[in-house]
């Protein structure tokens, strides 16, 4: 997995860029529910100094706030639908602006081609690369059902809806970036420590300077 990683993509501040003159490196982290994205993002944060922005966590925080926006998001998630791009992009933008870091892992977004195009058009940011955690549905289902303190939406029917949404919506995003040689594919069915060895090889150019 020690392939050469694309140079970080930095974006000059332009009028349309909602981040102002802030230059950032963004890595999209994609993979099905239960593929281990969250665990590995935590490792990347610790070892390589990135800030982890989970689209799902940001959406759940909005739900918890009790806002009208949060109620709409909650209903869509229960139905296994994808939240409108502008809602998630606004949450991600706000998080990047507020954070002093300039290296971000965006986990679980873009979820579809419309998300992807909207993110690039609104923020003027193109990812340095896409980290794709590839894992079978059988293994992901086993992991999700085996969680001691699973999320409230971790029941088998909802899990399978989430798999279906991922396959139909997210795989075209991965194919789009693969055509640009921007996808770094990880075998996520392996044990956590082995997966991280593969991740470390990809992120070596981003090692923190002590």
From Swiss-Prot:
It holds the Pfam family ADK. CMP binds at residue 115. A ribonucleoside 5'-phosphate binds at residues 60, 81-83, 108-111, 151, 162. Residues 54-83 are annotated as: NMP. GO terms for biological process: 'de novo' pyrimidine nucleobase biosynthetic process; CDP biosynthetic process; UDP biosynthetic process. SUPFAM superfamilies: P-loop containing nucleoside triphosphate hydrolases. It is found in: Cytoplasm; Nucleus. Its EC number is 2.7.4.14. GO terms for cellular component: cytoplasm; nucleus. Residues 146-154 are annotated as: LID. It catalyses: UMP + ATP = UDP + ADP; CMP + ATP = CDP + ADP; dCMP + ATP = dCDP + ADP. Its cofactor is Mg(2+). One of its GO terms (molecular function) is CMP kinase activity. Binds 1 Mg(2+) ion per monomer. Keywords: ATP-binding, Cytoplasm, Kinase, Nucleotide-binding, Nucleus, Pyrimidine biosynthesis, Transferase. ATP binds at residues 34-39, 147, 190. It is an enzyme of class 2 (transferase). HAMAP family: Adenylate_kinase_Adk, Adenylate_kinase_UMP_CMP_kin. Monomer. Catalyzes the phosphorylation of pyrimidine nucleoside monophosphates at the expense of ATP. Plays an important role in de novo pyrimidine nucleotide biosynthesis. Has preference for UMP and CMP as phosphate acceptors. Consists of three domains, a large central CORE domain and two small peripheral domains, NMPbind and LID, which undergo movements during catalysis. The LID domain closes over the site of phosphoryl transfer upon ATP binding. Assembling and dissambling the active center during each catalytic cycle provides an effective means to prevent ATP hydrolysis. This is UMP-CMP kinase 3. It comes from Oryza sativa subsp. japonica (Rice). The gene is URA6.
């Amino acid at each position: 997995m020690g392939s050469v990683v694309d140079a970080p993509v930095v974006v000059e501040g332009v009028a349309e860029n909602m981040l102002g003159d802030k230059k950032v490196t963004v890595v999209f982290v994609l993979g099905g529910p239960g593929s281990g994205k969250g665990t590995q993002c935590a490792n990347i944060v610790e070892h390589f100094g990135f800030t982890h922005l989970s689209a799902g966590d940001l959406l759940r925080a909005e739900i918890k706030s009790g806002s009208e926006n949060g109620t709409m998001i909650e209903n869509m998630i229960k139905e296994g639908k994808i939240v409108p791009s502008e809602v998630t992009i606004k949450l991600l933008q706000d998080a990047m602006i507020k954070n002093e870091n300039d290296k971000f892992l965006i986990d679980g977004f873009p979820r579809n081609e419309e998300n992807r195009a909207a993110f690039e058009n609104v923020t003027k940011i193109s990812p340095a690369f896409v980290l794709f955690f590839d894992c079978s549905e059988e293994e992901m289902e086993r992991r999700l059902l085996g969680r001691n303190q699973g999320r409230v939406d971790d029941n088998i029917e909802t899990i399978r809806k989430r798999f279906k949404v991922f396959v139909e919506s997210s795989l075209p995003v991965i194919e789009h970036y693969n055509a640009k040689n921007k996808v770094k594919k990880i075998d996520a069915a392996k044990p956590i420590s082995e997966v991280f060895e593969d991740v470390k090889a990809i992120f070596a150019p981003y090692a923190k300077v002590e």
